[in-house]
Design a protein with these regions (language model features):
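Compositional signal for N-terminal targeting/processing segments
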Residues: 1-184
Length: 184
């Protein structure tokens, strides 16, 4: 079964700035609390894998000393970890806009429609959810998710859509937490 935990992305990664209390993205105490929560849930569910909406590239781009909270927990617990999100090159290959290309596209649509840029950008990102979630499913599918206990950490905005996608593919899935963001 896949147990979905939604959170904010800033809690998914440790960086030197967070450890030193210099980050504007997340507080050290919040990341520590999320890390403890993952350990607790993994033990409770007897998880043998923690997968996440992230890629190694995305984690590294977060800054100096960056590493995945989920990967760290999995390593310490001696269980498998899996990055499920496509990296920049893979996103382009499957037709998704990324980085500056996405920002420019959102700016163009914003000007043409006279809508706020942030509103347009958020809508454009959400249009890509189903494609990205299909990649996550494909990567998890090879792990026989119906025959084991897998925790899947993702952004809170994906919790309902990813659960629905898993249900449609006849995968056992539950929402463990819709939005774990304590003090983020």
């Amino acid at each position: 079964m896949i147990h979905i935990i939604g959170t904010c992305h800033s809690l998914q990664v440790w960086t030197d700035a967070i450890r030193n209390g210099e980050s504007l993205d997340a507080r050290k105490e919040s990341v520590e609390a999320f890390e403890s929560y993952l350990v607790e849930v993994a033990r409770l569910l007897k998880a043998d894998m923690i997968a996440e909406e992230a890629s190694g590239e995305w984690v590294a781009a977060r800054g100096h000393g960056a590493y995945s909270v989920a990967k760290g927990v999995a390593t310490r617990m001696g269980i498998q970890h899996l990055f499920c999100d496509p990296d920049t090159g893979q996103r382009r290959t499957i037709g998704l806009k990324v980085g500056e290309e996405l920002r420019t596209h959102a700016m163009t649509v914003s000007k043409e429609t006279r809508r706020e840029w942030t509103e347009v950008h958020d809508a454009e990102v959400k249009k890509q959810f189903s494609t990205r979630e299909a990649v996550w499913f494909e990567r998890l599918e090879g792990c026989e998710p119906n025959n084991r206990s897998i925790i899947f950490v993702c952004g809170a905005d994906h919790v309902n859509t990813f659960k629905a996608a898993l249900d449609a593919k006849k995968n056992l899935a539950s929402i463990r937490c819709r939005c774990w963001t304590k003090g983020a």
